[in-house]
A protein has these predicted regions:
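Bacterial signal peptide processing site
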Residues: 21-23
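C-terminal motif of bacterial Sec signal peptides marking the signal peptidase cleavage site
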Residues: 16-19
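Stable alpha-helical elements in mature extracytoplasmic
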Residues: 53-57, 64, 91-95, 112, ...
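Post-signal peptide N-terminal segment of mature Sec-exported envelope proteins
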Residues: 26-45
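Active-site-surrounding "flap" and adjacent substrate/cofactor-binding loops of secreted or lumenal enzymes
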Residues: 38-41, 52-58, 63-129
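Positively charged n-region of N-terminal signal peptides that target proteins for export
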Residues: 1-4
Length: 651
């Protein structure tokens, strides 16, 4: 995003693609000699994926990936395929080896190694799961059906809330945006069964069909767990969730860092809830000690509080039953798990089949015991020299970003000085955390999968609430080392790159650096860019949510951002469905910043020397080829629709 600022939006895509034209750099004797001195390095270019019938200056993506696109089919158990998928697939296999290796060693009960083996085995034991059916949650369903008042519903929501089951609102613990050294409790709208509020509110035929399928799914899944009159319950649930959707904020509104920071006392929050017994909820949630909370969407909580008592008791019982079943369906019988997938996997994302059981078991084990697996993962698959090389890349990108800020013609010196100060304070984290999570208080069974999920939810909940009001742990990570992703945290002013993404095609230790600048370099620049995008730029170098721009500079920046938003809003990946440029603006700024800064950093890294020509491509060309390679991908139409409506790109 900062590149948006740094290059001022005046750089056209045509010029960017033109950088891959072979005529732009001379393949003279000097570059050939440089090539000879670096023959031990590969180009990192995946030549077999190229489509030479395409012109790189017209369609770089197809030029670099066209052959791959034509010959690649999306696996039947996936909604998409691409570079991210390839890495995740490889990591799944690696994690399976780690899990099975730990289990085969017959470790002592209670050890981390025993816990990952027991959890995995419990997930793989389909014979027991099928025999039990819905019995593991029968008592939970009975408790919901026994609720005899709205006060009891509020209290029971608290029990579900702490066990990780979705209710109409949620919370998380994160540094206070206006006191970033202290952890605060943030509350946000939640509780919908469909991916976004628009799935309930849009009149298009596609969404009407999805709602019809949703009603069928609810009818079936609640019947499978033993409830009666589920067709009527399904209609009541859809009606309730539609009412919740009507008062929820849009995703664009929920991106606004200023509007979503609303600190309230516990008494003020209780007053917002009106007819919902929030004090009873807080007591049951063990949150009575929390004096202040940050409310992200205040009007939603007020509207929810007003409507709560108007919704009859039976409807709340239906709704909570569905929330419970949705949460635990994958831990029940194969029949129940399959029915959930038929809707959420096939109807919503177009994926024909579930992944093999072992892959789901690996993902589930990873979601619960990720840092146990992560410790072994980094020892086996992330060499120290990769961390060192990555840290050098980050500093090169930081230098290039600083130069771009200094050269901005439209930004005043006052704002430039503060922007450079923020850039200097970026805290990069690479590979893995310095401190590992302690799972000693978490009990895992080798035979009871649902109890494992419940135990982890309570374990995680107690860890989180203990942080509220306390000092921020600077060593805390938001991702496990094996995660194929990266992120920027504005309130921490940190950029984080787990070991999982630091592999080819993003980061290739055996390749000459040009392709790495186009791959992981652009990812680094992307995350840095988030520090200066339309929302990240509202935080200063210490993570405080406060204005540090002059009024004129903010206006100039917003005008440029609006142009980018308008450009992306013209893109129509599916007929009749346009990208929402306001919603994707942060990611678009990050991408523009990332690639541009990565290219500038690469040129700076040459220090006046000629780049080698490898596989017939100059250094500059390989930077842009590297960028195109990491974004190769194919998507099913339903997956594209969901991605457009709720974008979740890396970072």
């Amino acid at each position: 995003m900062k590149k948006l600022t740094a290059v001022a939006l005046g750089v056209s895509m045509a010029l960017t693609l033109g950088a891959c034209s072979p005529q732009q750099e001379q393949n003279n004797q000097q570059s050939q000699q440089a090539e000879e001195t670096q023959q031990q390095l590969t180009s990192g270019v995946i030549l077999e994926n190229f489509d030479h019938s395409a012109k790189p200056q017209n369609d770089l993506f197809r030029y670099v990936n066209g052959s791959w696109i034509e010959k690649t089919e999306i696996p039947s158990d996936r909604s998409s395929i691409g570079a991210f998928y390839d890495l995740r697939e490889m990591n799944q296999k690696r994690l399976r080896d780690i899990i099975e290796g730990a289990a085969a060693a017959n470790p002592e009960p209670g050890t981390p190694e025993r816990k990952i083996g027991d959890f995995f085995n419990a997930y793989m034991d389909t014979e027991t799961l099928n025999e039990l059916g819905a019995k593991p949650i029968a008592s939970d369903l009975e408790a919901i059906q026994a609720l005899d008042s709205h006060e009891a519903v509020a209290e029971h929501m608290a029990r579900m809330f702490r066990s990780g089951v979705s209710i109409p609102f949620g919370f998380y613990v994160y540094p206070d945006a206006k006191d970033p050294q202290t952890n605060a409790m943030y509350m946000y709208q939640a509780g919908l069964g469909l991916p976004d509020r628009d799935y309930y509110l849009k009149d298009e035929e596609k969404f009407e069909d999805i709602r019809s399928e949703y009603v069928s799914y609810i009818t079936d899944i609640l019947g499978m767990v033993g409830l009666e009159n589920t067709d009527e319950a399904a209609e009541r649930i859809l009606d309730l969730e539609t009412k919740l959707a009507e008062v929820q904020w849009s995703r664009v509104e929920s991106r606004n860092a200023d509007k979503t920071y609303n600190k309230k006392t516990a008494d003020e929050v209780s007053g917002m809830f009106a007819n919902f017994d929030f004090k009873r909820f807080i007591e049951t949630s063990e949150l009575s000690h929390v004096e202040e909370m940050v409310i992200r969407q205040p009007s939603f909580f007020e509207d929810f509080g007003n409507m709560f008592a108007d919704v009859d008791l039976q409807t709340w019982q239906d709704y909570l039953s569905l929330r419970l079943v949705n949460e635990y369906a994958s831990a029940l019988s194969e029949e129940i798990s399959q029915r959930r997938f038929d809707f959420y996997g096939t109807v919503l994302r177009g994926t024909p089949e579930q992944e093999p059981r072992w892959k789901r078991a690996v993902d589930a084990t990873n979601s619960v015991l990720g840092e146990v697996l992560g410790q072994v993962y980094v020892k086996e698959y992330f060499p120290p020299e990769a961390k060192e090389k990555m840290e050098g890349l980050i500093e090169n990108l930081r230098d290039a970003y600083g130069e771009s800020i200094k050269n901005l013609e439209w930004m005043t010196e006052e704002t430039k000085e503060k922007a450079l100060e923020k850039l200097a304070k970026f805290d990069p984290k690479v590979g893995y955390p310095n401190e590992w999570r302690d799972y000693s208080e978490l009990d895992i069974s080798a035979t009871d999968l649902v109890s494992n999920y419940k135990a982890y939810a309570e374990f995680n909940y107690q860890e989180e609430i203990a942080k509220i009001g306390g000092p921020v742990d600077e060593e805390d990570w938001g991702m496990t080392p094996q995660t194929v992703n990266a992120y920027y945290s504005p309130v921490r002013n940190e950029i984080v790159f787990p070991a999982g993404i630091l592999q080819p095609p993003f980061f290739d230790m055996d390749a000459e650096m040009a392709v790495n600048y186009g791959g992981i370099g652009a990812v680094i620049g992307h995350e840095m860019g988030h520090g200066f995008d339309d929302q990240g730029s509202k935080y200063d170098g210490d993570g405080n949510l406060q204005s540090w721009w002059t009024e004129a500079d903010r206006k100039a920046f917003d005008e440029r951002g609006q142009k980018l938003s308008e450009q992306f809003s013209q893109y129509e990946p599916i007929e009749g469905l346009n990208v929402n440029g306001d919603l994707t603006l942060g990611e678009n700024i990050g991408d523009l910043a990332g690639l541009t800064i990565a290219y500038e950093a690469y040129k700076m890294s040459l220090d006046g020397e000629k780049a080698p020509v490898l596989d017939g491509f100059t250094g500059s060309q390989r930077v842009f080829i590297g960028w195109a390679q990491v974004w190769r991908g194919k998507y099913r139409e339903d997956a594209i629709r969901q991605q457009v409506m709720r974008p979740s790109l890396a970072g």
